[in-house]
Amino acid sequence: MVKNSVISVIFQEEKKGSVEFQVFNFTNKIRRLTSHLELHKKDYLSQRGLKKILGKRQRLLAYLAKKNRVRYKELINQLDIRETKTH
C-alpha cells in the first residue's frame, strides 16, 4: 500500500515538523474529507474545511517547490498528487 511506504520513508528521513510530513498529513485529511463529502453532499462546514486544508497544502507545496525542486517532485510522485500549473 502506498500510504505505508510513504510513512516509512518520511519517518526515516524527516521529523514530524518537516514540510513533507505536513503535506502527507494534509493529503490524508483531504482524502478522508473527500470520501465523507461523497456521502454527505450538503455538509458545507466540511466543504469549507476541505478548502482550507487544500489551500494550506498548496502553499506548503509551493514553498517546497521553490526551496528544493527534487524533494518536491519525489513527494508529489509518492503521494500521487498532480503538479500545479504554476510550478
From Swiss-Prot:
CDD domains: Ribosomal_S15p_S13e. One of its GO terms (biological process) is translation. It is found in: Plastid, Chloroplast. GO terms for cellular component: chloroplast; ribonucleoprotein complex; ribosome. PROSITE patterns: RIBOSOMAL_S15. Keywords: Chloroplast, Plastid, Ribonucleoprotein, Ribosomal protein. GO terms for molecular function: structural constituent of ribosome. InterPro entries: Ribosomal_uS15, Ribosomal_uS15_bac-type, uS15_NS1_RNA-bd_sf. The keyword Plastid applies. Its main location: plastid. SUPFAM superfamilies: S15/NS1 RNA-binding domain (SSF47060). Part of the 30S ribosomal subunit. Belongs to the universal ribosomal protein uS15 family. This is Small ribosomal subunit protein uS15c.
